[in-house]
């Protein structure tokens, strides 16, 4: 669990998986901010990622390399630009860019972990669940 929290705190980018209504998979890298309780990403409001995640209200994301991966799954809330300046400032600092300065309309997507799995090698597969039902496991 400590390694997982460290990765959430220190990584900058993650992969976001989503699917269209007709089942076409879509995968995109996004920068994020971890506030200790949720992941915050920003993407163009008209993007497939935003449309898919807002429609389903659920996300599955991956952080880290394949041999030290963290998989996070949970509900998504859309936050319009300007709704929470403090959170938006934190995202800009962590992500290295500020979507509020861009001409294209962006939306923030808050992903609240419901389940987290983490593992490095096959010997860690059995104990890979570190969060279930929104509660950290020992």
Give the label of every model feature segment.
Residues 1-15:
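Short, basic/aromatic recognition patches
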Residues 3-4, 49, 87:
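Hydrophobic alpha-helical segments typical of transmembrane helices
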Residues 6, 22, 51, 64-66, ...:
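Generic marker of residues within folded, mature protein domains
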Residues 11-45, 51-53, 59-63, 71-73:
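Short beta-strand segments
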